[in-house]
Amino acid sequence: MSEDEEKVKLRRLEPAIQKFIKIVIPTDLERLRKHQINIEKYQRCRIWDKLHEEHINAGRTVQQLRSNIREIEKLCLKVRKDDLVLLKRMIDPVKEEASAATAEFLQLHLESVEELKKQFNDEETLLQPPLTRSMTVGGAFHTTEAEASSQSLTQIYALPEIPQDQNAAESWETLEADLIELSQLVTDFSLLVNSQQEKIDSIADHVNSAAVNVEEGTKNLGKAAKYKLAALPVAGALIGGMVGGPIGLLAGFKVAGIAAALGGGVLGFTGGKLIQRKKQKMMEKLTSSCPDLPSQTDKKCS
């Protein structure tokens, strides 16, 4: 039984797949988004104990997401190759949503850390803005409204760093590792479906090439068989005539590849003719039992 014969049509698995991509995964992603909001709130307010608990709860949601994505993988691997394009179209939206949610969660903390470092390193520069003509009024220096607003928003947006002596610092590292693993799982899942489709396309190309080769090979074998059959009586006559008698009889059949003979030149020729007819009948029987291979021209026309 071939690998594809063990798989099933998409319509048989579609209800289960739709349940995951329409209900299960979106529910997990919504729960993860709420964890992200709570984490941001507790970290901004420096409520480290609550933040630690939220990190743990978010980690459980991430693990549930990973488990559900693996279940979808198992279902997708059972789908027949004919339905892979439709399957890919079906799962792409939820895959992209999961990837974006994971990246957003990781990016929030990353940007906050980088911004805090930038504020620390550039503290003196921020206190002494560059001078321009438009910024000097009556000898007093003023920052532009846009720059002041930007600095204010940056300070509000950036989350405070978690103290290393807090449990929340360690729990964040664990959650971060889980999020990265989830992101990699989503990427691998996407590559799995794409690689299956590429494999099918490659197989189709090889099948087309093989069909051309088989078609040409069949023609060449037919020609060779005809030449071989035509040579059998002549070779039988020549060797049978040279040897003569019962030995010539056997030699005539040896050339044809079968032990039978009639002896002498004429008998050698006759032996070759008999074998020619026998092989001809075998070829006709074999040819009639084999299905005709469709030519590439017929395939293109159809």
Curated annotation (Swiss-Prot):
CDD domains, A to Z: SNARE_syntaxin17
Sequence ranges on the Cytoplasmic membrane side: 2-228, 276-302
Stretches assigned to the Lumenal side: 250-254
Spans annotated as Necessary and sufficient for localization to autophagosome: 229-275
Source organism superkingdom: Eukaryota
Coiled coil: 53-123
Post-translational modification: Phosphorylated at Tyr-157 probably by ABL1. Dephosphorylation by PTPN2; regulates exit from the endoplasmic reticulum.
GO cellular component: autolysosome membrane; autophagosome; autophagosome membrane; COPII-coated ER to Golgi transport vesicle; cytosol; endomembrane system; endoplasmic reticulum membrane; endoplasmic reticulum-Golgi intermediate compartment
Phosphoserine: residues bearing it: S289
Residues that bear Phosphotyrosine: Y157
Major place of residence: endoplasmic reticulum
Similarity annotation: Belongs to the syntaxin family.
Name of protein: Syntaxin-17
Organism whose genome encodes this protein: Homo sapiens (Human)
Lineage of origin: Eukaryota, Metazoa, Chordata, Craniata, Vertebrata
Gene from which this protein is expressed: STX17
